[in-house]
A protein has these predicted regions:
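Catalytic glycan-binding domains that act on GlcNAc-containing polysaccharides
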Residues: 21-151
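Positively charged n-region of N-terminal signal peptides that target proteins for export
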Residues: 1-4
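Bacterial N-terminal signal peptides
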Residues: 7-14
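Sec/Tat signal peptide C-region and signal peptidase I cleavage site
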Residues: 15-20
């Protein structure tokens, strides 16, 4: 009996610690907002871009899951530096969102994750609900002005 009580207490403690964490750090939100402004994304498309970041959750070079495995030759893998890589990956994802998202996650999922589109759309829907709940349905931070971000 004691083991079960201890297990429950540990589970509740870990849930409480996780509940205070943001899904996306403020620093990344600022970069996502900048990319979204540069690509003229709507608020709905900006939420989707943030959701892609959270769902893909890749390391530097794969932050938005663009281009398949590292070293595959895809141009989105130009940088291993976290800052540059985030912007390049985010720009590729933003372009895909801008050109192909029409309000239907299942249809978009077939484009973004063709191997598992239905599951991708289901997970994305859940992530979007969580992100919007964390921020009270408002995109975090101020909307930045457009600016060019160029890397050599």
């Amino acid at each position: 009996m004691r083991k079960y009580v201890l297990a429950i207490l540990l589970s509740l403690t870990s849930l409480m610690l996780l509940a205070g964490q943001k899904s996306i750090p403020d620093r990344e939100w600022a970069m996502i907002r900048q990319i979204a402004v540069n690509y003229d994304l709507t608020d709905e498309q900006t939420w989707l871009l943030a959701g892609i970041r959270k769902l893909e959750n890749g390391r530097p070079g794969l932050e938005f899951g663009i281009g398949g495995p590292m070293n595959s030759g895809h141009p989105s893998h130009r940088y291993r530096d976290g800052f540059k890589s985030f912007y390049v990956q985010g720009a590729w994802a933003a372009g895909t969102v801008k050109n192909h998202y029409r309000g239907d996650l299942k249809v978009f999922g077939k484009r973004y994750c063709p191997a598992d589109a239905a599951n991708w759309a289901k997970k994305m829907s859940s992530i979007l609900v969580r992100l919007k709940g964390e921020t009270h349905q408002r995109l975090p931070g101020a909307k930045p002005p457009k600016r060019n971000i160029n890397f050599p």
